[in-house]
Curated annotation (Swiss-Prot):
Name of the protein described by the UniProt record: Glycine cleavage system H protein
Cofactor: (R)-lipoate
Cofactor note: Binds 1 lipoyl cofactor covalently.
Modified residues (N6-lipoyllysine): 65
Organism: Parasynechococcus marenigrum (strain WH8102)
Pfam families: GCV_H
Family: Belongs to the GcvH family.
GO CC terms: cytosol; glycine cleavage complex
Length: 129
């Protein structure tokens, strides 16, 4: 199965995405990662106001197969979390690049986005396996 990813998204090696929207960045996990996890049953996210370092664990996602940590693709302050995904984890599974987003961050260093893979590079990486 070949995966497609929104062209505006940037991706970390650990399969989290960052999508810049003005001064904020929406964060989630890729459709590829969601597919690998299988049925998602629980999501744990940080609180609004928490500060995250790039690469730091910011929560976890639990599926019937495994529990996986998630890592911040950029550093910043959590300004919003997706309460709908916390209440109904299947939202993440149904639309990981849309309604299944996880966090909105105010990045402390927006240039960190440039170090992430673009959608084409990420797509080539995950579709090659």
């Amino acid at each position: 199965m070949a995966f497609e990813f929104p062209a505006s998204f940037r991706f970390a090696d650990s399969h989290e995405y960052a999508n810049a929207d003005g001064e904020l960045v929406r964060v989630g996990i890729s459709a590829f990662a969601v597919d690998q996890l299988g049925d998602i049953v629980f999501v744990d996210l940080p609180d609004v106001g928490d500060s995250l370092d790039k690469g730091a664990t910011f929560g976890s996602v639990e599926s019937v197969k495994a529990v996986e940590d998630m890592y911040a693709p950029v550093a910043g302050e959590v300004v919003q979390r997706n309460e709908a995904v916390l209440a109904s984890p299947e939202e993440l599974q149904n639309d990981p690049h849309g309604e299944g987003w996880l966090l909105v961050l105010r990045p402390s260093d927006p240039s960190q986005l440039e170090a992430l893979m673009d959608a084409g590079t990420y797509g080539t990486k995950v579709n090659a396996g």
